[in-house]
Amino acid sequence: MSQDWKEYAKRVLDEWQPRTKLGMLVKEGQITDIHEIFRRGYQIKEPEIIDVLLPEVNARENQEIIDIALTVRMTDSGRRVRFRVLAAVGNRDGYVGLGIGHGREVGIAIRKAINYAKLNIIEIKRGCGSWECRCRRPHSVPFAVEGKEGSVRVRLIPGPRGLGLVIGDVGKKILRLAGIQDVWSQTFGETRTTVNFAKAVFNALYNTNRVVVTPEMIERYGIVVGRAMPTSFTLE
């Protein structure tokens, strides 16, 4: 974590008044690593938790506006126009979040979507599960995983180093934010539905956590959970 982001995290800590137990633990310095949150099974309900433990997701290059749509709703007083924004955030090293925000103005909807993406951040497993590579570096998924949303189904398959991301543009944005550099993919269903496709990719990444790995698999595929180079923020 760069010095600039450490200073940003300290400013957030100084101004933040936590409203949840987890927030208090972070504020008091009892939790200094985001991996600890997932290990203990806490639910993130305050975006400031991410601003402190994963401040680099606030960098412009670590945020993606995936889709902006205009929604019209008929009410007794006439038509009500609102914006719906789908956004993703990530540290490009094992953590990624996806969120949807609504608002009468596009700027408000974007800010809401980014905040919801922070609340929905997940920790993923990475590694080298490709039989063509076996470099044991965390550049791909360690094994094939599948995600589903609505009629859309996405399967991510380990790829060798240098392959790149063989998936649609929406999938590329989410995978890059998660720190995945090489992957094959198979897609099924109405993949032109941007929101469902994005959620299916996100769900596939989440499902890397559903596979129980053995010490032998960790050694063989170079499996890493979360950051490849763990760092933590402290008040000191």
From Swiss-Prot:
Taxonomic superkingdom? Archaea
For this entry, the protein name equals Small ribosomal subunit protein uS5
GO MF terms, alphabetically ordered: rRNA binding; structural constituent of ribosome
Assembly and binders = Part of the 30S ribosomal subunit. Contacts protein S4.
* Xref: SUPFAM superfamilies: dsRNA-binding domain-like (SSF54768), Ribosomal protein S5 domain 2-like (SSF54211)
User: Which GO BP terms, alphabetically?
Assistant: translation
Q: Does the keyword Ribosomal protein apply?
A: yes
Q: What is the purpose of this protein?
A: With S4 and S12 plays an important role in translational accuracy.
Q: Name one GO cellular component term.
A: cytosolic small ribosomal subunit
**Organism the protein comes from:** Pyrococcus horikoshii (strain ATCC 700860 / DSM 12428 / JCM 9974 / NBRC 100139 / OT-3)
Positions of the S5 DRBM domain: 61-124
